[in-house]
């Protein structure tokens, strides 16, 4: 499927079609596919320099690291870290940094270093309408071919995205979605929704009920670098999520019914998505109160501005080491590859379809020998306390508490 996508894009560019859009489920190799397209087009000298844009610095770093693995003997530069290497063949940047660089980085004669013709191709990581609205000046300035990447399901991509990429009849250049990856090719694992002991009541509003302006507003929250602006929940949600009994039952649900580590003594690698930083800290504090035997090591906080967030995340990536649970708001939604994750807890209300898909994507990756020699990861489970699946009109397979085993 990656080869098919690479072939279609390269053929389009050769024909003079300047815009391509790839829809690929999280975990199926969007970055690797993009790197292959860049490699083919630059080695054939059909394209010169390339710009890779992402909306967060963590994703910029991850993309550059991935390209290094896939493309040999090509100069690369993370513009956020080293503007001195700006002559590189491939530049990686956030939208904000590039927008600033266009005006501020100059040649010796005072002219702009990044001229309109500097790049032959711009790769847009997670292409969606908020990006084009907020940073359209970049795409208006550079005269380059475009390659859009998105994990958003084809039938939920906004019309304006298709229009931006000149997709006739709303048909992307190539599509490879979660269902095909799971059911046909088995390159991702399925998930099951666990019936939880408590859920917040709501007004029955779904994503389909939102008008375009409301959807636009929610998706726009997802564009900022360094962390998404936290949605301020209604008072009723605040009262619910900061309730000791609610959080204690949520933790109990996870510890009793989550997929367990191969040792059978406790749950496997887990991400809890909290509503905001205060809520995340509240969950960690309640866990430590309920399980003092772990001495604060089992469940850790991974949020922006937390001094030990980086180390906690590094430790979380170690398959058999503490912590086994990380509590986050936005840091672990995208760009974090931990195949050992078997449990996701949605303790936050999500209004962005993009964010929802990326949160789910944290659990979809295959993992060999996770439960011992020859016993691979076959599934993961999701605990949803905020009716997010109902909001997005998703009806996945469910299980009652107690059905899940290692």
Predicted feature descriptions by range:
Residues 96, 110-148:
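SF2 helicase catalytic motif II
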Residues 89, 228-328:
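Conserved C-terminal RecA-like helicase domain
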Residues 21, 49-51, 64, 71-83, ...:
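Conserved RecA-like helicase motor-core motifs
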Residues 159-267:
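Interdomain helical connector at the RecA1-RecA2 junction of SF1/SF2 helicase-like NTPases
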Residues 81-90, 96-117, 136:
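Conserved helix/coil segment N-terminal to the catalytic DExD/H
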Residues 21-23, 48-56, 268-276:
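Conserved RecA-like ASCE P-loop NTPase motor core of nucleic-acid helicases/translocases
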């Amino acid at each position: 499927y990656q080869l098919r996508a690479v072939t279609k894009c390269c053929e389009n560019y050769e024909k003079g079609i300047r815009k391509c859009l790839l829809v690929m489920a999280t975990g199926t190799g969007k970055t690797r596919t993009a790197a292959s397209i860049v490699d083919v087009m630059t080695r054939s000298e059909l394209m010169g320099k390339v710009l890779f844009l992402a909306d967060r610095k963590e994703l910029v770093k991850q993309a550059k690291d991935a390209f290094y693995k896939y493309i040999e003997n090509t100069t690369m530069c993370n513009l956020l870290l080293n503007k001195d290497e700006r002559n590189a063949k491939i530049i990686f940047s956030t939208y904000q940094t590039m927008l600033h660089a266009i005006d501020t980085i100059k040649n010796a004669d005072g002219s702009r270093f990044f001229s309109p013709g500097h790049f032959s191709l711009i790769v847009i990581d997670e292409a969606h309408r908020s990006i084009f609205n907020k940073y359209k000046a970049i795409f208006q300035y550079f005269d380059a071919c475009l390659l859009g990447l998105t994990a958003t399901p084809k039938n939920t991509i906004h019309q304006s995205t298709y229009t931006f990429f000149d997709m006739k009849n709303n048909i992307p250049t190539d599509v490879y979605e979660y269902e095909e990856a799971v059911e046909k090719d088995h390159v991702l694992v399925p998930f099951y929704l666990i019936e939880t002991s408590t859920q917040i009541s709501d007004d029955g509003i779904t994503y389909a009920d939102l008008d375009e302006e409301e959807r636009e507003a929610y998706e726009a929250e997802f564009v900022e670098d360094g962390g998404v602006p936290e949605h301020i929940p209604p008072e009723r949600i605040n009262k619910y999520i900061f309730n000791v009994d609610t959080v204690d039952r949520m933790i109990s649900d996870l510890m009793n019914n989550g997929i367990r580590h191969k040792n059978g003594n406790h749950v496997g690698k887990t991400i809890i998505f909290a509503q905001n930083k205060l809520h995340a800290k509240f969950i960690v504090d309640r866990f430590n109160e309920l399980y003092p035997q772990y001495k604060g090591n089992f469940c850790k906080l991974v949020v922006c501005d937390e001094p030990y967030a980086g180390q906690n995340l590094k430790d979380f990536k170690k398959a058999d080491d503490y912590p086994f649970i990380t509590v986050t708001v936005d840091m672990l939604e995208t760009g974090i590859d931990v195949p050992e994750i078997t449990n996701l807890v949605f303790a936050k209300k999500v209004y962005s379809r993009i964010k929802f898909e990326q949160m789910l994507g944290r659990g979809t990756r295959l993992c060999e020998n996770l439960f011992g020699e020859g016993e691979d990861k076959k599934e993961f489970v999701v605990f949803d306390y905020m009716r997010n699946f109902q909001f997005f009109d998703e009806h996945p397979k469910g299980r009652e508490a107690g059905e899940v085993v290692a």
